A protein has these predicted regions:
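N-terminal auxiliary segments of SAM/dcSAM-dependent transferases
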Residues: 1-71
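Alpha-helical elements of Rossmann-like donor-binding domains used by nucleotide-donor carbohydrate transfer enzymes
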Residues: 5, 9, 25, 53-56, ...
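Residue-level signal for pocket-adjacent positions within structured domains
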Residues: 33-34, 41, 65-66, 71, ...
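SAM-dependent Rossmann-like transferase core, predominantly class I methyltransferases
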Residues: 42, 55-133, 137-152, 275
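An acidic site on a long C-lobe helix of protein kinase domains
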Residues: 50, 90-93, 219
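S-adenosylmethionine
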Residues: 131, 135, 140-284
Length: 291
């Protein structure tokens, strides 16, 4: 099977450009080929066992299975993260969220306490631990399988992160204090299913995709409530959001006493991120004014 033949099989599904990118990823990451090797047609020189494995990979790709799950890894923030169907495949937009946090937090004390709620693969928590040295990073998820993947990523990449099986819908510990709380929670509604790619719907975990009870605001309310009680003075909450609900999320933060609320667009121009600041003096002033 030649490179051209493989591309011809995948192009109807993925388009020529993406099919070529996927094939290059497979040949480089799984079979150790360089771009020059691919151009020189060395795929035809693979051993019988490797050729059989490659054929199985192409067959899985023809069924729309994400190449990241097939290879067991995904690039995020210049690092390779292990991924399985127990976790979402990290998105480029989430890299932008990490950069925003890094740029904002870089102006504060290095001994900051960071909490990542709904960590999945651990891509946010691990990235922040590595990019903001000295930070104490904790990450929660309700899925044990996801936490195992996240722990593997932290160990392999040399990041110090405390992973905890925890549910923000039940947690209530006012003694835990944070400087930054970040979350990219499930926020997709059932009405948006028709617009989603088939491979996402078929293979990625619905628990991490779809908002419970079709309520896209569910986790934003819960996390805002928790953050308002567990952030240190001047602490911040960062969300990745469903652009359709940016106004509602902003209002939720306002109703929980957050100030300096910023809605930020991603590189595609969609309102994708929100940041709010908890200010103790502001809240006490509001209470005084109410009296």
């Amino acid at each position: 099977m030649t490179h051209v033949e493989m591309k011809q099989r995948l192009t109807p599904l993925y388009g020529e450009r993406e099919a070529q990118a996927i094939l290059r990823m497979v040949l480089e990451m799984r079979f150790g080929m360089s771009h020059a090797d691919i151009l020189c047609g060395k795929v035809t020189q693979l051993s019988a066992d490797d050729t059989e494995e490659l054929e199985k990979i192409i067959a899985r790709l023809e069924k729309n299975e994400p190449v990241q799950y097939i290879l067991g890894q995904s690039d995020f923030y210049g690092r390779q993260f292990h991924v399985t169907p127990a976790v979402l495949i990290p998105r480029p937009e989430t890299e932008e969220l990490c950069t925003w946090i890094k740029e904002t937090a870089g102006q504060s004390s290095p001994k900051r306490a960071i909490l990542d709620i709904g960590t999945g693969s651990g891509c946010i928590a691990v990235t922040l631990a590595l990019e903001l040295p000295g930070s104490q990073v904790e990450a929660w998820d309700i899925s044990r399988d996801a936490l195992l993947v996240a722990q593997q990523n932290a160990e392999r990449l040399g990041a110090t992160v405390k992973f905890v099986e925890n549910d923000v819908q039940k947690v209530a510990d006012p003694s835990m204090k944070w400087d930054i709380i970040v979350s990219n929670p499930p926020y997709i509604t059932l009405q948006e299913k028709a617009e989603m790619e088939a491979n996402v719907l078929a293979y990625e975990p619905h628990l991490a995709l779809f908002a419970p009870n079709n309520d896209a605001m569910h986790f934003y309310r819960l996390i805002s409530h928790y953050a308002a009680r567990n952030l240190n003075d001047g602490g911040m909450v960062f969300f990745e959001i469903n652009p359709l609900f940016s106004d509602g999320i902003k209002e939720t933060l306002l109703s929980h006493g957050f100030t300096d609320i910023v809605v930020k667009s991603d590189t595609f121009g969609k309102q994708r991120f929100v940041r709010g600041t908890y200010t103790k003096d502001y809240l006490e002033g509001q209470k005084t004014a109410d009296v």
